[in-house]
């Protein structure tokens, strides 16, 4: 179980001191793709940011098309088809919204800020909180499993996780001993990050590095970009990278897949 592994393996390296407001859940493009006053829509195109692998996202979102058609019908709109796709990157979704090749999208707050000249927020989301919310990394490494609570939250933290590789465990041991990591410690690790418009997967960790070391993710010697957090977790489990960055509830979200899907060790 991942619970056991949390006690000795996949430690939280650092908890970035940034809390981010939840993403602009549903964003509409600023360009009108139907005739004025028309309530007939042949295809309503929704693009999703790739925070998980495309297959998982599309399976989970399968009921969404029918729900949107029903809701729009109640508002007097006749929608022929709802097309749901997953973008190749966070920026790709923002670009599609800006260009009008997507009518609406589920994006991060960071992506919205980048493309807000052409997009408007339609809905924002809340999510379930988790039972840990500390700025002290050792509190996340106390051997107890992160779990979702019944409370809703309007923010979440960005964290940096160390994996089972030799370097990852070296960094985790230093943090758990109460020692401050140096820039050389961090620069000697291989990092997996998300695209540059991802809030928890790039922007906030980069700001944390700047505030603490005067450096950014772009200054790290060994960085690979993942197409989803699922890919980052898989790379971490396989020891292909030493460190990943992402949202604070990553371990709770991916616990069931750590060994069965990602090949992580107990």
Segments from the language model and where they lie:
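Ligand-binding "clamshell"
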Residues: 42, 114-149, 254-266
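A conserved helix-loop-strand patch within extracytoplasmic ligand-binding domains
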Residues: 127-198
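C-terminal motif of bacterial Sec signal peptides marking the signal peptidase cleavage site
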Residues: 21-28
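Bacterial signal peptide processing site
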Residues: 30-32
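Short, well-ordered beta-strand elements
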Residues: 36-57, 81-86, 188-193
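Short helices/loops that flank or line small-molecule/ion binding pockets
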Residues: 77, 83-105, 110-118, 228-259
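Short, polar/charged alpha-helical segment
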Residues: 46-47, 53-80, 207
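Pocket-lining segment of extracytoplasmic ligand-binding domains
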Residues: 187-266
């Amino acid at each position: 179980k991942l619970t056991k592994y949390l006690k000795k393996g996949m430690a939280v390296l650092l908890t970035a001191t940034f809390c981010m407001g939840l993403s602009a859940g549903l964003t509409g493009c600023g360009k009108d793709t139907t005739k004025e006053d028309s309530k007939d829509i042949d295809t309503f195109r929704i693009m999703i940011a790739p925070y998980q692998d495309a297959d998982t996202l599309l399976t989970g979102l399968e009921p969404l098309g029918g729900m949107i058609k029903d809701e729009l019908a109640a508002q007097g709109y006749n929608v022929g088809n709802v097309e749901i796709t997953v973008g190749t990157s966070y920026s790709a979704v923002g670009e599609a919204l800006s260009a009008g090749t997507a009518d609406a999208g589920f994006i991060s707050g960071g992506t919205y800020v980048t493309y807000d000249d052409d997009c408007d927020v339609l809905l924002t989301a809340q999510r379930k909180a988790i039972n840990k919310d500390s700025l002290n990394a050792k509190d996340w490494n106390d051997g107890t499993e992160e779990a979702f609570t019944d409370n809703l939250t309007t923010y979440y933290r960005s964290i940096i996780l160390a994996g089972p590789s030799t370097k990852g465990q070296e960094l985790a041991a230093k943090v758990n001993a109460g020692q401050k990591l140096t820039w050389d410690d961090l620069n000697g690790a291989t990092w997996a990050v998300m695209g540059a418009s991802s809030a928890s997967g790039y922007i906030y960790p980069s700001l944390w590095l700047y505030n603490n070391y005067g450096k950014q993710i772009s200054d790290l010697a060994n960085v690979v970009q993942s197409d989803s957090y699922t890919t980052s977790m898989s790379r971490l489990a396989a020891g292909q990278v030493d460190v990943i960055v992402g949202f604070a509830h990553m371990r709770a979200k991916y616990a069931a897949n750590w060994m069965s899907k990602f090949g992580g060790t107990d």
